[in-house]
Curated annotation (Swiss-Prot):
It is found in: Cytoplasm. The gene is ARO1. Homodimer. One of its GO terms (cellular component) is cytoplasm. ATP binds at G864, M865, R866, G867, A868, G869, K870, T871. Residues 1050-1266 are annotated as: 3-dehydroquinase. This is Pentafunctional AROM polypeptide. The AROM polypeptide catalyzes 5 consecutive enzymatic reactions in prechorismate polyaromatic amino acid biosynthesis. Residues 400-837 are annotated as: EPSP synthase. The active site is at E263, H278, C819, H1171, K1200. NAD(+) binds at residues 46-48, 84-87, 115-117, 120, 140-141, 162, 180-183, 191.
Length: 1556
C-alpha cells in the first residue's frame, strides 16, 4: 500500500482526479471543501459502512473543516440497504425525492461512499438530478477501487439485466483510501480480486504471473482476523501487493477510459468476463456477487476463445487455476456457488436473452472480448461472436452432427500430455529434491486436484513459465505435513490412489491426520486392497464412510515400516504404482509382492518403474519370484527437465476417427517407443481391423478403410482404450471380442456395462463377459439414432460416443459433455475446429427418476424373512406386471438336483450359501429384465450377495423387501418343519437381518395380516398399486392450481383407531398426510419402521387416496427430535422405499439428507417445506426467497412455505409473494387465525383438518367445507356454473341427488339439474351458449345420446373413442367441449369393491350387446379376465363386438354349455324391465350360475327396484348380486372429479343414492 499521508495521483481524461493513498480521510475532506465548493454536500452510503463508523468519522471531519474556514455549507447523509437489490429504480427515486424534500439545488455535490452498488447508483442520481450535479467517488471495496469507481459509467439494474439504464457521468474526483480495506469482509476481498485478475488477463501478462504466485499469502492474510474485532484485518503482510494491484489497475483503466471515454471500442476490453458474467449475475443476484459471476464469465469467455481456435488450452487452464487459487468460482458447479445460490438454475436461453441486451452488442450480434493469450486480446475491441458458439460453451450437453463426407483429408492432432505420466511426474517431483521443469503436462480437472493436494501437503512449490507451457516444480525431498483442510479429489481416481500411499509419509502439522475425500462417485470406487496393504505395513488408516472407499482418515507421523508388502494387483495397477513410488521413503527397503494372479495393466507398472529410474531410484525385479520387486531406500533427485508424452489413451480418439471416416490422422508425439500401453492401439486394434497404420518410434498415422472387420483382442495392456475399440467395432463386419479389461468395471463407472447399455441405443448388440465384451457390428445404414447418450460423467464414454455419433446421418445428443475436461479439455474444439464436425450446445430435459440403467423392465429381486410371503406375493407381482416368476430356492434345487435341507445336511451351510450366491449372480446378470425373483431369506447373510444386490439396485434394478408383522412371521416359522432349522433364535435372526434387508433394498412392501378373502383381495390390490408406483406405471401428477386441491393432515397417534372413519374424514381431499412424527408407539419418541409400515398399510386398506408422508422435526413445529439425524434419514427413506406419492422434505433437513432424497426419489413427488412458527419472517424478507430457491435447487415438485400471520395484512403480502413466484408450483399459507384467509386463497394442496381429528395439525387450519364456503362467499367459485344430465327418459335419474348432495357436503355453490331431450344438436347449442358465458360446469349424457353427441364435441378421450360412446362432457380450454366415458371405471370399481380381484379370472360373461357392453368388455379386460363371453338375443350383434377384441367370444346357450365355461363374473347390460322377457338370457344366466361355485353378478342398469335378475341370483349360494346403482355412483364420483378437480365425497354420495 502506501505510507500514511502519501498520495499517488493518476491522470484520467486530462486531469489528475484519481487520488490513491492510505488513511487519507483528512486529504479527502480538505480537497473537497477547498476545490469542490457547494452549499450542500450529500454523503450516501449503505448500512454496512455506516455501522463501521466511517460515516461518523467523515461527518466529524467535514464539520470541523466547515467551522475552521467559516463555511456555511451543510452535510446531509442518506443510508440505503446493502446489496445489488438496492441498485434499482425504486431506490434511485427514493433518494431523489428525499433530496428534493431537503431543498437540494444545482450546486449540490454528492459523495458516493461505498462499493460498486453505491458508486454506480449514486453516479446515476448525480447524472440526472437537476439535469446533472457534481459527484465524488469514495470506493470502500477492492472491486470498486480497481474497477467500478473509475470511468464515469453509472447505472441501475432492471429486471432484464444489469446496468441497462444509466449514463456516462464522470466524477470530479475519485479518492481511493486503501485503509477502507482493513474492514472489508473476506468474501468481498475475494470478490474484488476477480476484477484484478480480469485486468491482468487481458492487459498485463507480467502482473498475471505475479498474481499466480501471490494467492497463498493473500488469502492467509485476509482470513487472519483481529480476535477483538473480527471485522478488522491486519493487511501489513500484503501492503505492497495491495498497493501494486490498486495502483496498477487504476492506471490501466484510466488509460483505457482516456482513450475511449464513451465505449466506442477499446473500452469494451474492460468488459472481459462481463458479457457472460453479467448474464449469470442477472439470474443469481443477490446470492452470487459481481466478482464471483465475472470469474465464471472469464472462464466461459476463455473457453469460447479456445473453442474458436484462438486461445491455447494452456492459457485457459492457467486462467482457471489462477481464479481458483483466489477461491473464486470457475463454474456453476462450484460447491460454494451451489450452496449460496441454493442451486438456482441458469437456463442457457435465459443467459442468451440477457446477453442480447448488452450495451456492447451491434444490433442482434453479440460482442465478447476474446483473448488470444494471457495479457493480449484478439482485437482491440470486443469481437462479434455467433450465438451458436456462445450456446455451445454455456451448454452442459452437446448435439454432434455428421462429419463432412467427400474428399478424404489428412489431419495432424497433438493430444494433451498423458494423465498417467503427468500424475506420476507430480508425485516423483514432489517427493524429489530440487527444481524440475515439467513440459507438456496435462491441464485437466484430475491433474489440478493432484497439484492442489501436493501444495496443501507442502510437498513442492509450483511456478508457471513460458506462458504456462512449463511448470517449474521445486520438490521438498518428501517432507510432507498434515494440512488443516481435507484433500478433496473430485472424481480423480489416479490422484486418490497415489496420494493414499503418499499421505502415510506425512508428518504432523496443522492436524495430526490427513483426510482424503472426493465426490459421490469417488466415494463408491474401490481402494480397499491398497489400504489393506498399507495397514499391514504399519499405516493407520480408517474408512470414514463405506468400507473400502474414500473418504479415508490417515494418521500422520506413522509412516511405512518397509520390508515385505503384499498387494492384490488384479483390480488396479495404480495400487502397485502408488506403493512403488512411495516405497523409497519407508523405514527399511521394500519388497513388493503382487498377489492374486496376473497383474492388470502391467504396462503401467513398467511405466512407473521406468519413471522412477529417471528420478534416480532403480527398482529391481526378483529373478525367482514372479511379480515381485525390490525397492531401495532413497530420495528422488529431480532432473532439470522432464517432458511428458502426449496421452496415448486420448490419442486413440483422433486415430479412431480416421478409421471410421476414411481420413488420415497423424499423432506426432506417440510412437512405438512410448511408455504407455495404449500406444499399441493403432497396431493391435486398428491395423488388425483393416486400417493402414504407419508407426515410427515417435509418431503414429492411421488411414481408415471403407469396410472394417471384427477382431478378437486381449486389451489388458491398454484397458482404457477398449471404449474406443467398441465404437469402431460397432461399425465393423462381424463380432468383435475384447478381453482383459475386468478393471474397467471399477473406473469412473462400470464401463463395460456402460458401453453395452449405450451402444444398444444405436441398435448395436453387445454381451458382457466376465473380463470383457462382445460387440456385434452392424452396417452404418442400420444404426439407430439415440434420443441421447448418457456419459456417466466419464470422459472416455463421452469421447468414444462422440466418434460414433459423428458418422450418423441424424444428430445425436451427448449428456454431460464437460466430463472430457478430466483428460482433454479441448476435445470438442478438436472435433469442431480440426475435423469440422458440426456441434451444437443443448440443454436436455432432465427427468428425475431411477438411475440410468438401460433396464426398460427392471427385474424385481425379492428379499425378506422366510414366511414373509415372498413366493406368494412374488407370483402375484409377476402376474400383475406380466413378468416371469422364479423362486431362487426352487431353481437351486433343480439346478443341483437335490433339496436344500439335503444339501445343507450333506455339505453344510457355507456350501449352500456359496451355491446360492453363484445362482444369484447368474440371475442378476442373465435375468435383469422382466423377472420377479424370490430369494432365500438368508441371502443377505452373505456379504458378496449384499454387494451384488446393491450394485443391481445402483443401476436401476429393484430389490424389494417383502415384510409382514414380525409376530406373524415368527408364529408361522415356529410351526414350519418343512425347511432347515435356524441355527439361532428366530427373534435374534430377525434383529440381525433387519439392517441387512434395509441396506440392500430399494423398496419395501408391508403385507398386513389377512383374516378374510376380502382382506386378502385388498392386499393384492395394494400390491398392484404399489408395483405401479415403483415401476412408474402410475405416477402422481401435481394438480394445477386452478383445481382447488387439498390434503387432510392426520394427527392420530395410531390411525387404526380411525380406520373406519377415514373415508368420511377425507371427503373432498386430494391426498392424506401421514404425520409420522405424531405416531405414538408405546410412548417412544420415535416409532419403529414396522409400526410406520403398519400405519401406511391401514391407510392403503381403507382409502384410495395418494399419501403425503411427513416427518416433521421439532424445529419445524413437529415432534421428531432434532438431534437424531440417522433415525430421521431412516424414516424419511422408508417413505421413499414404500413409494409414497408425495414426500415432505424440510428444507432445513441436513444437506446430505436433502441431496440423497432428491437423487433417490424414484417416482415419488417431493414437497419442499419450510415453516416459520415463531413468525420471525415477513413475506418480503430475503429468507423466503432463499427457501424458494433452495427448494427449486433440490429440485422439489411443490414448494411449501408456511408463515405465521400477525395481522390480516400478512395475507396480502403473501399473495404478492405468490404472484411473483410462479416458476414452481407453490403451496403458500399463513398460520394462525389472522392467516386463515390465505388457506382459502391457496388452491394447491391446501392442508385441511376435520372436526373428528384429535387436534388440528397447525394453528388456523380449516375444514374443506369451511374453505369452500368462504371461497364461494368471496367469489372464488362461479356460482352460475351449470351441471346437468341430458337424455330421455331422465325423470327417475339418481344423478341429480348424487351430485347435489356431494356439492352441498363440500360447500360448493353449484346446482345439478335435468335437460330432457333426444336431440344432440339441442344439447350442443345449450352447452355452447353456457361456454360462451363461462358458465358450463359439466354434463352427464345418457341414452339415447351417448353416440349421437360425439360429432358435436371438439375432443373425445381415447377410451371413449374405443367404446364409441360418451357419458361425460367436460368444458375444455378456449371454449372447447371434451367427451369422456366413466362407465368403465364405474363398472371396474363396483366389481373390485365386491371382491372381483379375489376371484378366478379365467372367464367372465356379458349379457347384452348394446353400448354399455363395450364398456363392460374394456372394464373386464382391465381387471385381467383371460376370456370374455358375450351373449345377445341377436347373435350377430354379439359377434360384431367380439370381433373387435382378442379373447372375446360370442356365445349361445348351446355353445356355452358345450364348452363347459365357468365364469366368475356376469355383467348384465340388458335393461332391467326387458330381462325377464328374454328367455335365452334367463337360461344362459342360470347355466352360468350353476357352472361356478361362486362369483359376482353386476346389473349395469341403474335400477333401485328388485329386478328379475336380482331375484334369480338371490336363490344361488356362493353368488352375490351388485345393484347397478353402485356402478352409477362410482361413475358419478369420477364425473365429479373430472368437473371440479376435487375427489368426490363418496360416503355421502352413496348414501344419498343407495340409502342405508
Amino acid at each position: 500500500m502506501f505510507a500514511e499521508g502519501q498520495i499517488q495521483k493518476v491522470p484520467i481524461l486530462g486531469k489528475e482526479s484519481i487520488h490513491i493513498g492510505y488513511k487519507m480521510q483528512d486529504h479527502i475532506v480538505s480537497e473537497i471543501v477547498a476545490n469542490i465548493k457547494s452549499s450542500t454536500y450529500i454523503l450516501v452510503t449503505d448500512t454496512n459502512i455506516e455501522d463501521l463508523g466511517y460515516v461518523e468519522s467523515l461527518k466529524t471531519k467535514f464539520e470541523a473543516a466547515f467551522a475552521k474556514d467559516g463555511i456555511k455549507s451543510r452535510l446531509l447523509t442518506y443510508t440505503v440497504a446493502p446489496g445489488e437489490t438496492s441498485k434499482s429504480r425504486a431506490t434511485k427515486a427514493a433518494i431523489e425525492d428525499w433530496m428534493l424534500s431537503k431543498g437540494c439545488t444545482r450546486d449540490t455535490v454528492i459523495l458516493a461512499v461505498g462499493g460498486g452498488v453505491i458508486g454506480d447508483m449514486i453516479g446515476y442520481v448525480a447524472a440526472t438530478f437537476m439535469r446533472g450535479v457534481r459527484f465524488v467517488q469514495i470506493p470502500t471495496t477492492l472491486l470498486a477501487m480497481v474497477d467500478s469507481s473509475i470511468g464515469g459509467k453509472t447505472a441501475i439494474d432492471t429486471p432484464l439485466g444489469k446496468n441497462l439504464v444509466g449514463a456516462f457521468w464522470q466524477p470530479v474526483n475519485i479518492f481511493i483510501d486503501t485503509s477502507f480495506l482493513e474492514t472489508l469482509p473476506v468474501r468481498e476481498f475475494i470478490n474484488g480480486m476477480a476484477e484484478v485478475i480480469k485486468t491482468a488477463a487481458f492487459y498485463d501478462a507480467e502482473e498475471f504471473t505475479r498474481l499466480e504466485s501471490a494467492s497463498e499469502i493473500f488469502l492467509s492474510t485476509i482470513k487472519k482476523r483481529d480476535a477483538k474485532d473480527p471485522r478488522r484485518v491486519d493487511l501489513s503482510p500484503i501492503t505492497d501487493t495491495i498497493g501494486r494491484i490498486v495502483l496498477g489497475s487504476a492506471r490501466i483503466k484510466a488509460a483505457v477510459v482516456s482513450a475511449d471515454e464513451r465505449e466506442g471500442g477499446l473500452r469494451n476490453l474492460l468488459n472481459f468476463g462481463h458479457s457472460i458474467g453479467h448474464a449469470y449475475e442477472a439470474i443469481l443476484t443477490p446470492y452470487i456477487l459481481h466478482g464471483e459471476c465475472v470469474a465464471i464469465g472469464m472462464v466461459k469467455e476463455a473457453e469460447l476463445s479456445r473453442y474458436l481456435g484462438i486461445l491455447s488450452p494452456v492459457a485457459v487452464a492457467r486462467l482457471a487455476k489462477c481464479i481458483k487459487a483466489y477461491e473464486l468460482p470457475v463454474s456453476l458447479d462450484d460447491a460454494t456457488v451451489k450452496a449460496r445460490s441454493h442451486g438456482k438454475k441458469c437456463p442457457v436461453d435465459d443467459l442468451l436473452r440477457i446477453m442480447g441486451v448488452d450495451k456492447k452488442n451491434d444490433g442482434s450480434t453479440k460482442k465478447i472480448v476474446i483473448l488470444s493469450a494471457i495479457g493480449k486480446t484478439h482485437e482491440q475491441k470486443a469481437s462479434s461472436v455467433a450465438d451458436k458458439d456462445i450456446r455451445f460453451v454455456l451448454s452442459e450437453e452437446v448435439i454432434v452432427g455428421e462429419a463432412p463426407v467427400g474428399d478424404k483429408k489428412s489431419y495432424t492432432v497433438t493430444p494433451p500430455g498423458s494423465k498417467s505420466i503427468s500424475n506420476r511426474a507430480f508425485v516423483l517431483t514432489a517427493l524429489g529434491k530440487g527444481p524440475c521443469k515439467l513440459r507438456n503436462l496435462l491441464h485437466s480437472d484430475d491433474t489440478q486436484h493432484m497439484l492442489e493436494a501436493i501444495e496443501l501437503l507442502g510437498g513442492a512449490s509450483f511456478e508457471w513459465e513460458a506462458d504456462g507451457e512449463t511448470l517449474l516444480v521445486t520438490g521438498n525431498g518428501g517432507k510432507l505435513t498434515a494440512p488443516a483442510q481435507e484433500l478433496y479429489l473430485g472424481n480423480a481416481g489416479t490422484a486418490s490412489r497415489f496420494l493414499t500411499t503418499a499421505a502415510t509419509l506425512v508428518q504432523k502439522g496443522d492436524k495430526d491426520h490427513v483426510i482424503l475425500t472426493g465426490n459421490k462417485r469417488m466415494q463408491e470406487r474401490p481402494i480397499g486392497p491398497l489400504v489393506d496393504a498399507l495397514r499391514s505395513n504399519g499405516a493407520d488408516i480408517a474408512f470414514q464412510n463405506a468400507e473400502g472407499s474414500l473418504p479415508l482418515k490417515i494418521e500422520a507421523g506413522v509412516g511405512l515400516k518397509g520390508g515385505l508388502i503384499e498387494v492384490a494387483a488384479t483390480v488396479s495397477s495404480q495400487y502397485v504404482s502408488s506403493l512403488l513410488m512411495c516405497a523409497p521413503y519407508a523405514q527399511t527397503p521394500v519388497t513388493l509382492s503382487l498377489v492374486g494372479g496376473k497383474p492388470i495393466s502391467q504396462f503401467y507398472i513398467d511405466m512407473t518403474i521406468a519413471m522412477m529410474a529417471d528420478f534416480g531410484v532403480v527398482v529391481t525385479k526378483d529373478e525367482t519370484k514372479e511379480h515381485t520387486y525390490h525397492i531401495p531406500q532413497g530420495v528422488y533427485t529431480n532432473p532439470e527437465e522432464y517432458v511428458v508424452e502426449s496421452d496415448a489413451s486420448s490419442a486413440t480418439y483422433p486415430l479412431a476417427y480416421a478409421a471410421m471416416t476414411g481420413h488420415t490422422v497423424t499423432v506426432p508425439n506417440i510412437g512405438s517407443k512410448s511408455l504407455q500401453g495404449d500406444a499399441r492401439f493403432a497396431i493391435d486394434v486398428l491395423k488388425a481391423m483393416g486400417c493402414t497404420v504407419e508407426q515410427t518410434a515417435t509418431s503414429t498415422t492411421v488411414t481408415g478403410v471403407p469396410n472394417l472387420k471384427a477382431i478378437a483382442v486381449d486389451m489388458e495392456p491398454m484397458t482404457d482404450a477398449f471404449l474406443t475399440a467398441c465404437v469402431v467395432a460397432a461399425v465393423s463386419e462381424g463380432t468383435t471380442v475384447i478381453t482383459g479389461i475386468a478393471n474397467q468395471r471399477v473406473k469412473e463407472c462400470n464401463r463395460i456395462e456402460a458401453m453395452r447399455v449405450q451402444l444398444a441405443k444405436y441398435g448395436v448388440v453387445c454381451r458382457e463377459l466376465e473380463d470383457g465384451i462382445e460387440v456385434d457390428g452392424i452396417s452404418r445404414s442400420d444404426l439407430k439414432t439415440p434420443v441421447s447418450v448418457h456419459s456417466y460423467d466419464d470422459h472416455r464414454v463421452a469421447m468414444s460416443f462422440s466418434l460414433l455419433s459423428s458418422i450418423m446421418a441424424a444428430p445425436v445428443a451427448i449428456e454431460e459433455r464437460r466430463c472430457v475436461e478430466k483428460t482433454w479439455p479441448g476435445w470438442w474444439d478438436v472435433l469442431s475446429g480440426v475435423f469440422n464436425v458440426p456441434l451444437e450446445g443443448v440443454t436436455l430435459a432432465k427427468t428425475v427418476s431411477k438411475a440410468e440403467s438401460g433396464l426398460s423392465k427392471p427385474s424385481i429381486f425379492i428379499v425378506g424373512m422366510r414366511g414373509a410371503g415372498k413366493t406368494h406375493l412374488g407370483a402375484q407381482a409377476a402376474n400383475h406386471l406380466g413378468y416371469e416368476f422364479i423362486d431362487l430356492d426352487q431353481l437351486l434345487e433343480k439346478d443341483l438336483d437335490t433339496t436344500i435341507p439335503q444339501l445343507i445336511a450333506d455339505k453344510g451351510w457355507d456350501h449352500f450359501r456359496a451355491e446360492e450366491l453363484r445362482l444369484l449372480k447368474q440371475c442378476l446378470n442373465d435375468k435383469s429384465e422382466g423377472y420377479v425373483i424370490s430369494c432365500g431369506g438368508g441371502v443377505v447373510e452373505t456379504p458378496a450377495a449384499r454387494d451384488a444386490l446393491q450394485t443391481f439396485k445402483g443401476v436401476g434394478g429393484i430389490v424389494l423387501h417383502v415384510h409382514r408383522p414380525v409376530s406373524r412371521i415368527l408364529e408361522y416359522l415356529n410351526k414350519d418343519q418343512s425347511r432347515p432349522a435356524f441355527v439361532d433364535d428366530l427373534e435374534a435372526v430377525w434383529q440381525r437381518r433387519k439392517e441387512l434387508y434395509r441396506s440392500v433394498s430399494s423398496n419395501v412392501f408391508f403385507a398386513p395380516h389377512c383374516d378374510s378373502a376380502e382382506a386378502t383381495a385388498k392386499v393384492q390390490q395394494m400390491l398392484g398399486a404399489f408395483l405401479d408406483r415403483v415401476t412408474g406405471k402410475s405416477e402422481f401428477v401435481i394438480p394445477h392450481k386452478d383445481q382447488f386441491t387439498s390434503f387432510l393432515s392426520l394427527t392420530f397417534p395410531d390411525v387404526s383407531i380411525a380406520a373406519t372413519m377415514l373415508p368420511s374424514l377425507s371427503e373432498g381431499c386430494s391426498a392424506l398426510e401421514l404425520r409420522v412424527d405424531l405416531l405414538n408407539e408405546n410412548d417412544e419418541a420415535i416409532p419403529s419402521e414396522e409400526y410406520v409400515l403398519s400405519q401406511l398399510a391401514i391407510l392403503r386398506q381403507n382409502v384410495d387416496l395418494p399419501i403425503l408422508y411427513t416427518v416433521r422435526t421439532k424445529a419445524q413445529g413437529g415432534r421428531f427430535p432434532d438431534d437424531k439425524p440417522v433415525e430421521l434419514a431412516n424414516l424419511v427413506n422408508l417413505g421413499l422405499k414404500t413409494a409414497v406419492e408425495l414426500l415432505d422434505v424440510e428444507l432445513t433437513y441436513p444437506a446430505e439428507l436433502v441431496s440423497s432424497v432428491g437423487a433417490s426419489r424414484g417416482y415419488t413427488k417431493l414437497l419442499g417445506s419450510h415453516h416459520d412458527f415463531p413468525g420471525a419472517l415477513n413475506w418480503s424478507s430475503l429468507e423466503w426467497e432463499n427457501m424458494y430457491a433452495r427448494a427449486e435447487a433440490v429440485p422439489v415438485d411443490v414448494v411449501k412455505l408456511v408463515g405465521m400471520a400477525k395481522s390480516f395484512s400478512d395475507n396480502f403480502a403473501l399473495e404478492n409473494f405468490r404472484e411473483a413466484h410462479t416458476s414452481s408450483p407453490l403451496l403458500a399459507i399463513n398460520m394462525g387465525s389472522h392467516g386463515q384467509l390465505s388457506r382459502v386463497t391457496n388452491t394447491l394442496l391446501t392442508p385441511v383438518t376435520h372436526a373428528d381429528l384429535p387436534v388440528a395439525a397447525a394453528p388456523g387450519q380449516l375444514s374443506v367445507e369451511e374453505i369452500n364456503q368462504t371461497r364461494s362467499t368471496i367469489g372464488m367459485f362461479n356460482k352460475n356454473l351449470s351441471f346437468f344430465i341430458v337424455g330421455t327418459p331422465i325423470g327417475h335419474s339418481k344423478s341429480p341427488i348424487l351430485h347435489n348432495t356431494m356439492f352441498k357436503k363440500l360447500g360448493l355453490p353449484y346446482e345439478y339439474s335435468r335437460f330432457k331431450t333426444d336431440d344432440a344438436a339441442a344439447v350442443n347449442a345449450k352447452a355452447r351458449a353456457l361456454l360462451a358465458q363461462g358458465n358450463l360446469g359439466g354434463i352427464s349424457v345418457t341414452i339415447p345420446l351417448k353416440q349421437d353427441i360425439i360429432p358435436f364435441l371438439d375432443e373425445v378421450s381415447p377410451l371413449a373413442q374405443q367404446i364409441g360412446a360418451v357419458n361425460t362432457i367436460i368444458p375444455g380450454p378456449n371454449g372447447t367441449l371434451k367427451g369422456d366415458n366413466t362407465d368403465i371405471l364405474g363398472l371396474v370399481n363396483a366389481l373390485t369393491r365386491f371382491g372381483a380381484n379375489s376371484l378366478d379370472k379365467k372367464t367372465a360373461l356379458i349379457v347384452g350387446a348394446g353400448g354399455t357392453s363395450l364398456a363392460a368388455v374394456h372394464g373386464l379386460r382391465s381387471l385381467g379376465f383371460a376370456k370374455i363371453l358375450i351373449a345377445n338375443r341377436t347373435l350377430s350383434k354379439a359377434e360384431a363386438i367380439a370381433d373387435k377384441f382378442d379373447n372375446v367370444e360370442a356365445v349361445t346357450l348351446d355353445s356355452f354349455v358345450a364348452n363347459k365355461y365357468t365364469p366368475s363374473v356376469i355383467v348384465s347390460c340388458v335393461p332391467a324391465t326387458t330381462f325377464s322377457m328374454l328367455d335365452e338370457s334367463n337360461k344362459l344366466v342360470s347355466a352360468a350360475l350353476a357352472a361356478s361355485p361362486k362369483g359376482l353378478v353386476l346389473e349395469a342398469a341403474y335400477s333401485a327396484e328388485a329386478t328379475p335378475l336380482l331375484k334369480q341370483v338371490m336363490d344361488v349360494e356362493g353368488w352375490e348380486f351388485i345393484s347397478g346403482l353402485y356402478m352409477l355412483t362410482e361413475q358419478g364420483f369420477e364425473q365429479f372429479r373430472l368437473w371440479t378437480g376435487i375427489p368426490a365425497p363418496k360416503e355421502v354420495g352413496e348414501k344419498a343414492v343407495l340409502g342405508n
